């Protein structure tokens, strides 16, 4: 079945465009060392390059990805191996894929009632972290001391 769903596109379109986005991200990481680490623009350069009025209809993802290429000079590339101001730990391939799953499922895990799976996995993993760090048992989820971020 390939009908337009709550994705606002058909599932086939979603797959096709999703692969393009993943390829764009992979290409970015393959070439990250070729970008200057720090932004190469002056204040207002990016805004001045944007259209004065919003688009009247949706745009193709190919065009959006081309726009992303144009944005590169206005970015500080925190994940670059040449960026030494802070640790380059803001993201990773597994984290990007996990973000896709989290965003794709649209889960809001603010309470156990809103997503038992989120809450129970979070508390379990944090209990593992307590053990790995050799912290006292009082920081585990079965006490009043912790277990949820």
What is each residue range found by the language model?
Residues 1-145:
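N-terminal entrance/gating region of PLP-dependent enzymes' catalytic architecture
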Residues 148-149:
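Conserved core of the PLP fold type I
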